[in-house]
Structure formats: C-alpha cells, structure tokens
Amino acid sequence: MKFNSFFIPVFFILFILIFSLSTFIPALSEYGYVSSYYPNNYTNSINISSSNFIWPAPGYNKITSYFGYRNAPTSGAGTYHGGIDIAAPTGSNIIACSSGIVTFADFYGANGFTVKIENGNLTFLYSHVSPTFLVHVGQYINKGEVIAKVGPKNVYNVPNNPYKDSNGNPTNGATTGAHLHFAIRKDGQAVNPLNYF
C-alpha cells in the first residue's frame, strides 16, 4: 500500500513535468529565445496594443544588429542599441508600420537622417534614411505609406556632422553602411521591437 501511495503521485508529477517541457521548449523556440529570429519565418506584421503594425522594410528581413547591449560597430555608436538594424540597400522603400503624425524629419546625431512618427504613447523612429525626405513634420501618415528611402552611407552638406568613415568622408550618423535602424519608444522609453512580433 505504501509503495503505490508514494509512487503514483511521483509518476504523475513526472508525467506532468515531461508534458510541460515538451510544450514549453517549442514555445521558447517560436518566440526566438532558443533559435534566431527572422520576421519572415512568421509574418511581416507586429502586434502592439492589439493593433496591427507592418514590417517597415518590405522584402528585407535580415536583422544585422539587435536591441540591447552589443559591441559598438563604429566610432560614435553606443554599446547600448535602442532598436534593430535591418539590412537593406540604398534607395529601398521604408514604410510606416503605423499610422500617425510626423513629429521629426531631419538629421538626428548618431541616427543620421531620421523620421519620427507618433501614435498615442508610441514613437516610431526610422533612421539612416535618405536626406531627400518624402514626408514633413505635422503630416498625417497612413500605415503602409512609403515615408522614406534607405539612405546612403555617406552624406554631405550636414553642418557640424562629427560622423566620418575610415576615409574621413561624412556618414549618415554612426553607420558602417546602408541599412534601416528601426526603433520603438513607449512612453519615451526604448523597447525591443522584436518583443512585439
């Protein structure tokens, strides 16, 4: 009697534990905690506050630098990265992942030429874009609208631009090449965009 009363609960607990792990491990993988995350493995949309947002670089899903601490890729770049870098060639379309109001369209230090769009308590930053802006401050933008093009590595005619490449040519902020730096700020605080995919 003592044998059954002890081992039946133990076997039951082991069964629950094994079942839980077999369910939990794939879930970790699905959300990027076990394997690398590439948005095209799932969908090209993100979900924040139950509203759908769309991927800002259509056709380009390779992330070259993730949110958080990293080795700075170039002089002037911080070790804390407040967004993600999406590899895309110069001239590629950048679309608004959300509707909102343009609150900034200018050179923004290490971010280079940047467009900011606000929607409630969220601010979306699209950085290292072309200096030929397609939008202006105060303009209402619809989700999916082309708002900018991926900018070149080198930009000229930016007064007091401290960012330079190894040849001394001025760069589009702290950058080593053409890409989109995409960031989301919630209530003014940087959040990891990949947490919302």
What are these regions (language model features)?
Residues 1-13:
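N-terminal Sec-pathway targeting helices
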Residues 181-186:
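Short, exposed beta-strand-loop hairpins at the edges of beta-sheets
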Residues 79-82, 96-137, 154-173, 178-179:
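Zn2+-dependent peptidoglycan hydrolase active-site motif and core
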Residues 25-113, 120, 143, 153, ...:
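Surface-exposed, glycine-biased beta-strand/turn segments
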Residues 139-140, 187-190, 197:
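Post-signal peptide N-terminal regions of Sec-secreted extracellular proteins
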Residues 12-20:
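Bacterial N-terminal signal peptides
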